[in-house]
């Protein structure tokens, strides 16, 4: 027997265990047609109420990314994307691709900057979570037109076959693997590895900040 937890479930467990940062693959979100079906991942509501920083490769590209970002804003969740060498307003990543067509609400340059944001939120006692989007390494990213065509086909087939609710995501992911071949598998491994490295570096920088803060002498009033 094997299994895993959702981002929402992992956030709850992390908060109980005192873990401030964790890395994952891709965030759940608002499904296409979610304005009618109300099919919205619990990942989003948990980000609105549980103070844990999540590092992910954005959200899966077959979701409604625009509505997902709007939902996170409503929940009061910070969403920031690592610039990863880019300048200006950059896209929120969409799992297999570095761009999504939707601009990131904010941009973070370094792991140290992300750690400072996490610490500031903790000091202010703001209880919502934080999402730091880490774009897939450029050499492993899938071409946006290719993956969009595969997504459209997989989502259409899921609708035609009645795969809704909890059955939708597994079907779409499985179909995308068939349509893209080994490219999606290789991209999955690359983005998870990149997220783990990024998350570990953020956690290390946060630990350094916490240590330096605790060693500072108390100020007299």
Features from the language model and the residues they span:
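Ligand-binding beta-strand-loop-alpha-helix segment within the catalytic cores
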Residues: 1-20
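General beta-strand structural signal in soluble alpha/beta enzymes
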Residues: 3-4, 21-26, 32, 54-56, ...
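Active-site glycine-rich loop that binds ribose-phosphate moieties when present
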Residues: 4-7, 35-48, 52-74, 111-116
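Short coil/turn connectors at secondary-structure junctions
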Residues: 16-20, 24-27, 34-35, 41-42, ...
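Glycine-rich beta-alpha junction loops
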Residues: 28, 58, 83-91, 133-140
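Anionic-ligand binding region
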Residues: 92-123
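A C-terminal functional module that forms or caps the active site or interfaces directly
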Residues: 121-193
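Eukaryotic N-terminal low-complexity, Ser/Thr- and Lys/Arg-rich leader segments
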Residues: 209-221
């Amino acid at each position: 027997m094997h299994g895993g937890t959702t981002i929402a479930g992992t956030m709850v467990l992390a908060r109980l265990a005192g873990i401030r940062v964790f890395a994952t693959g891709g965030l759940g979100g608002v499904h296409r047609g979610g304005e009618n079906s109300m099919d919205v991942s619990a990942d989003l509501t948990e980000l609105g109420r549980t103070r844990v920083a999540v590092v992910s490769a954005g959200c899966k590209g077959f979701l409604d990314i625009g509505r997902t970002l709007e939902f996170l804003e409503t929940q009061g969740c910070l969403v920031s994307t690592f610039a990863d060498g880019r300048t200006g307003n950059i896209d929120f990543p969409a799992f297999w691709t570095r761009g999504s067509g939707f601009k990131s609400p904010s941009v973070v340059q370094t792991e140290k900057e992300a750690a400072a944001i996490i610490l500031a939120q903790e000091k202010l006692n703001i209880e919502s979570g934080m999402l730091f989007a880490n774009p897939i390494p450029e050499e492993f990213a899938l071409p946006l037109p290719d993956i969009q065509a595969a997504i459209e086909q997989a989502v259409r087939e899921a609708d035609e076959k009645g795969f809704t609710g909890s059955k939708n995501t597994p079907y779409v992911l499985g179909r995308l693997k068939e349509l893209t071949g080994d490219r999606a598998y290789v991209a999955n491994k690359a983005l998870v590895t990149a997220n783990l490295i990024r998350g570990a570096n953020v956690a290390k920088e946060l630990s350094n900040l916490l240590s330096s803060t605790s060693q500072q002498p108390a100020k007299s009033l």
